[in-house]
């Protein structure tokens, strides 16, 4: 289904990082070429070997890792990507992306990508609702990022509220919507009318059409 498509998964330092292992597996089973980039903090929650085993690709954390196969890894990978999903996205990484800071492999590669970029915030409710975080998310949308609203439920801190990373199927659906569905209507303007229309020729005459005979 996704053969020939390349997806970058950006994983940041959140307890919800474990969900991305399952997402990576789901994408791989759809024959997608999956590359995982992790922040250093993310490695405290899940080991890079997990992603390497699931995707058959090297999981990159260090920008200056000399064991990569491309000359300029972050640029080469960015050129190949069809979509980037950063999930879970911490408040820290969201702030970096909102202001173009590129100080690790994940943020550097994202900045170099020209494809669709999707961010899925995951954090404490108060952190998510903080005016600064909300402003950063709004700023990302102004730069053509798509933001997935967090789910509501019990968080790692035992609070109940919004801030949970959505389930893997929801995240997968966002990716599929972007790269697996034909967009043959993209750029086409469609007019929907509930009855007869009239277009003036001059102050006296007009062109019209019959009613559809559909009544509500």
What are these regions (language model features)?
Residues 214-216:
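Conserved small/polar residues in nucleotide/adenosyl-binding loops
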Residues 1-118, 124-210:
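A cross-family phosphate/adenosyl-ligand binding-site feature
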